[in-house]
C-alpha cells in the first residue's frame, strides 16, 4: 500500500494519461522534493510508479500530458535509488539504445542519458558504454543529426563527468569523428565542436594540434561569419583561462596579427583574449611580439569615442602593459582626461593596480581634484584605491580631506549603491594594519564600519547624487 502522497501522484499519472490532460505540475514537483529511502522502500513502489511515468513519456501526446516536463525532474530522483542493474529491469539495454539512436523521443532520450549519468561509476555502466560504442555514437548524434538542445546538454554533461582512466579510454573513439567535423568546416557544426574540444582537451593529452589550432587563413575566411569568429575567439579565451595543457602559441599569434583587420565586434572579443593573456605569464612573449600595447597601435584611444583600444587599456593587466611599453604614461595616459571623461575613467581604475603607473598618477590624486568628482565616480575610485596597499598608503597619508569628509562623515547616504560602495571601501581599508598611516585612521574607520554594519538602519530612498555627463 502506497502512502497518501505517493498514491495521489500515481492516481494523477494514470488519470492524466487516460484523459490526455495536463498533469498536476505543482503536486509532482512537491512530491519530487519529498522522495527519500522510506518512499521508495514501499512495497511494489517502483513496479507501479515507473511504468506509469513511462507510459506518458513514450506517448505521442506526452507534450500535452506533461507540458512543464515535471516527469523529467521526477524520474531521475526515483531512479537515483536504484543501481544500474536494477534500472535495466525497467529500461533494458535495447530500450536505451533504441531511444538514443533509433526512435528519438526527446524526453525519453533525456531519461536514457540520465540513467547513464546516475550510474556512471558502476562497472556495469562502463561495460554497457564500451560494448555498445555509446560515446562515439552519441557524438554522431551531436554532429550529424538535428539533436534537441536538451539531449545535447545531457551528452555534453556525460562527457564532462568522464574523468576516470577507464572512462577516458572511452573518449578516444571520439577523435576520428572530431577530425571529420574539423575538416568539414561547417560553422554550425563547428560551434558545437568547439565546446566539446574544450571539454576533451583536459583528458586527452595526445590531442592532435590540428583539432584545436585554427590557421590565419581560416580566421580570415570566417570574417564572413562574424558570429562564428566570435565563438572561435571565445574558445581560445576559455582555453587560456583554464590553462589547457596544449601549446596555443601559433593560433594566438595569428589572431593578434589580424587584430586590425577585424570589425569592432570581433576586435572586442580579441580584447577579452588579450586581457586574459596579459594575466597569464606564459603568454607574455606572444603579446610582446604582437606589439599590441605599443603607442603606435593605440592611436584610436585618442578619438574620444568608444573603441577597442579604450577597452584594451581598461581590461588588460596594467603592469604587463607597462612592461611591454615603458612609455605608456607619457605617450598615452598623460594625454587622456582620465578623471573627467567617462570613456577614459575605466582606464584610470584599471591602472590603479600598477605600482609603477600609480606613482605617476598620484600627483593628480589630491584632495582638491578628487573633491570635484561626482560622488559615484569618487566612490568607485576610492574602492579601487582601497584594494591595493600602495594606493591605501596614499589615501591614508595624503588625502585627509577625502578620508574625513567622504569616508568618515556621519551623514546618511541615501543612495543604495553609494552606501554599499562605502561599506566595501571601509572593509578593504581595515583588512591590513601594516599599511603606513593605518594606525592614525584605525579607530575612526572601525567606528564608522561598525556603525554602518550594526548600528544604522539603511533606508532605501531616492538618490540625491548628481551624476553629470562628462564625455565631452
UniProtKB/Swiss-Prot annotation:
Its main location: cytoplasm. It is found in: Cytoplasm. One of its GO terms (cellular component) is cytoplasm. GO terms for biological process: DNA repair. It comes from the Eukaryota. Pfam families: HSM3_C, HSM3_N. InterPro entries: HSM3_C, HSM3_N. Involved in DNA mismatch repair in slow-growing cells. Acts as a chaperone during the assembly of the 26S proteasome, specifically of the base subcomplex of the 19S regulatory complex (RC). This is DNA mismatch repair protein HSM3.
Amino acid at each position: 500500500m502506497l502512502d497518501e502522497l505517493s498514491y495521489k501522484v500515481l492516481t494523477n499519472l494514470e488519470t492524466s494519461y487516460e484523459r490526455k490532460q495536463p498533469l498536476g505540475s505543482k503536486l509532482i514537483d512537491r512530491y519530487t522534493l519529498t522522495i527519500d529511502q522510506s518512499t521508495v522502500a514501499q512495497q511494489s513502489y517502483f513496479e507501479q510508479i515507473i511504468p506509469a511515468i513511462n507510459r506518458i513519456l513514450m506517448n505521442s501526446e506526452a507534450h500535452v500530458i506533461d507540458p512543464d516536463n515535471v516527469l523529467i525532474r521526477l524520474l531521475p530522483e526515483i531512479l537515483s535509488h536504484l543501481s544500474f542493474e536494477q534500472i535495466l529491469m525497467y529500461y533494458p539495454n535495447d530500450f536505451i539504445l533504441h531511444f538514443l539512436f533509433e526512435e528519438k523521443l526527446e524526453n525519453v532520450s533525456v531519461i536514457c542519458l540520465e540513467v547513464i549519468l546516475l550510474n556512471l561509476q558502476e562497472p556495469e555502466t562502463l561495460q554497457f558504454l564500451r560494448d555498445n560504442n555509446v560515446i562515439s555514437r552519441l557524438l554522431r548524434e551531436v554532429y550529424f543529426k538535428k539533436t534537441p538542445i536538451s539531449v545535447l546538454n545531457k551528452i555534453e554533461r556525460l562527457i564532462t563527468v568522464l574523468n576516470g582512466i577507464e572512462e577516458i579510454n572511452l573518449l578516444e573513439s571520439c577523435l576520428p569523428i572530431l577530425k571529420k567535423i574539423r575538416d568539414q568546416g561547417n560553422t554550425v557544426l563547428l560551434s558545437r565542436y568547439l565546446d566539446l574540444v574544450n571539454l576533451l582537451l583536459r583528458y586527452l593529452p595526445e590531442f592532435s594540434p590540428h583539432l584545436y589550432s585554427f590557421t590565419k587563413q581560416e580566421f580570415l575566411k570566417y570574417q564572413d561569419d562574424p558570429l562564428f569568429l566570435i565563438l572561435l575567439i571565445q574558445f581560445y579565451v576559455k582555453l587560456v583561462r583554464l590553462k589547457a595543457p596544449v601549446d596555443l602559441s601559433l593560433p594566438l599569434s595569428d589572431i593578434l596579427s589580424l587584430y586590425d583587420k577585424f570589425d569592432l565586434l570581433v576586435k572586442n572579443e580579441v580584447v577579452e583574449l588579450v586581457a586574459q593573456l596579459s594575466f597569464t605569464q606564459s603568454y607574455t612573449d606572444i603579446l610582446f611580439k604582437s606589439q599590441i600595447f605599443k603607442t603606435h597601435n593605440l592611436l584610436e584611444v585618442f578619438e574620444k569615442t568608444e573603441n577597442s583600444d579604450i577597452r584594451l587599456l581598461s581590461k588588460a593587466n596594467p603592469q604587463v602593459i607597462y612592461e611591454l611599453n615603458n612609455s605608456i604614461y607619457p605617450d598615452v595616459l598623460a594625454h587622456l582626461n582620465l578623471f573627467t571623461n567617462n570613456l577614459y575613467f575605466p582606464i584610470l581604475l584599471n591602472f590603479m593596480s600598477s605600482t609603477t603607473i600609480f606613482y605617476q598618477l598620484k600627483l593628480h590624486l589630491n584632495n582638491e581634484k578628487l573633491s570635484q568628482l561626482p560622488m559615484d565616480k569618487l566612490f568607485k575610485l576610492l574602492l579601487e584605491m582601497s584594494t591595493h596597499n600602495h594606493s591605501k598608503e596614499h589615501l591614508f597619508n595624503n588625502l585627509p580631506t577625502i578620508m574625513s569628509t567622504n569616508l568618515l562623515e556621519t551623514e546618511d547616504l541615501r543612495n543604495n549603491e553609494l552606501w554599499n560602495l562605502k561599506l566595501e571601501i571601509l572593509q578593504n581599508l581595515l583588512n591590513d594594519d601594516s599599511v603606513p598611516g593605518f594606525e592614525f585612521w584605525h579607530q575612526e574607520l572601525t567606528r564608522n564600519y561598525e556603525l554602518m554594519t550594526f548600528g544604522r538602519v539603511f533606508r532605501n530612498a531616492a538618490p540625491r547624487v548628481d551624476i553629470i555627463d562628462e564625455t565631452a
